[in-house]
Amino acid sequence: WLCAHLWEHYLYTGDIRYLGHIYPLMRGAAKFFLSTMVREPKNGYLVTAPSSSPENTFRMPGDKESAVSICLGPTMDTQLVRELFTNTLEAAEILTLTDKPLLDSLKSALNQLPPHTIDSEGRLMEWLEEYEEVDPQHRHVSHLYGLHPGNQISPTLTPELARACRATLDR
C-alpha cells in the first residue's frame, strides 16, 4: 500500500530521478510478495496467507457461532499485490531496466492472482469464498480498494465490477 503512494507521487511529478530512487523499494516489496505468497488449494491461485480483510470477520459454513478473520487471499490483498506488481513492471519499463528474471516472475504471478469475483447477491466478494459476514453493515469496505483509491475497477472499463461495488455500498 505504501508503494502506491510513492508511485502516485511519481505519476504526479513525472520526476524520473525520483522514480529511480523509489524503484528499489517497489522492487523489494514485489520480491517480498513473490517469496511469501502461496498456492490456494481449491483453484491454484497465488495468494497471501495467512491474512485477513481489515477488521471484518465471517462465519465458517455450518458454524453460526464463530467469528473468523484469518483467511487466504482476501480481495484487498490481491488488489494491492496486483497494483504493486503492475506499477513495478511499469516503473522498470520507464527506467529501461533489464531485470528480466524478476520482471518475468511478476508477469507470471499477475496471471496467477485470483480474479475479482461477484457473489450471489451481486456484490464484490471480500474473500475467496462466499462467507456469511458476522456484521453485514460493517463500516469497512476495504475490498473496494480496486475501485478507490486503486484503479482496477471503473464504470467504463469494468462496468460489471463497478455495479458489484455499487451493490456493496448500497447494502
Where are these regions (language model features)?
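Acidic/histidine-rich catalytic neighborhood
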Residues: 28-91
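Active-site core of glycosidic bond-cleaving carbohydrate-active enzymes
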Residues: 1-16, 20-24, 74-171
